[in-house]
Amino acid sequence: MKNSIVKFSLTALAAFTLAACGSSGGSSDNTAAPSNEQKTQMTPSKTNQPTPNSTEANQNQTFTGSAFVISEQDDKVQVKNVKFNDANINQLEVDGKKITLTHPGIYSGSWQRIKDRINNTDVCCGSKYQNVRMGVSLSNGPTEDDILFYKGIPTQNMPVTGLASYKGDSIILSDDISDDSDEEAVEGQSSFDVNFGAKTLSGSITANNAPTINISANISGNSFEGTAKSTKLTDGAVEGKFYGNNAVELGGLAKANDNSWGAGFVGKKQ
């Protein structure tokens, strides 16, 4: 994985500029800035005060996840921010190209490498998560796209009160992960605390030899957006969603404002 990610981190993250895109499995905006999800306004019940077990039903934006899609033509890198609209966690479809995310009969609880004639896809983390997938799909040639993604089955019944903690997995990609010049990407952990009443999320992404990335976000519907900061890496932005019944899992992406690093993460409610 380390060697195959070099093309992604050295060419894509170093020149991370968002462009318009299309996907047979999703949609995109047409600006050069990161796309903003359409947010559903959440209105508390006027007749009853919510109890600790209350949920908000149907608070799902139409997209089910997103990806950074990196292509290179004539030494020029282009990056597209794709939104997925389907909830098939076994497959991605980008620009008509289908990418397998699971193998039948394989129930690994850790990172899984899936190869085909076009891509090498590293997916987290098999049977460990029931409602979301996150990973990196790397092309076998310079004319194909590289993809950093998360996708799942969005929560339909978001909690409106209470606290929850999530722990899970992450991947950080950067030219400056550590003193080891050959190490361009590392797999690690994620940890988040959520206040559903205040609609806030905070936490961190960590990985061996990589600086900790601290996450702070606001929740709208079943999605969240916010900032990603580190004492050793440049500041960035984060996006993500809650997945499964009663927000049992979450997933998302983050990247630096100066495009020097990118990250994906997933987590499970404890």
Describe the predicted segments one by one.
Residues 9-10, 228:
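Generic detector of short alpha-helix boundary/capping microenvironments
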Residues 1-9:
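Bacterial N-terminal signal peptides that target proteins for export
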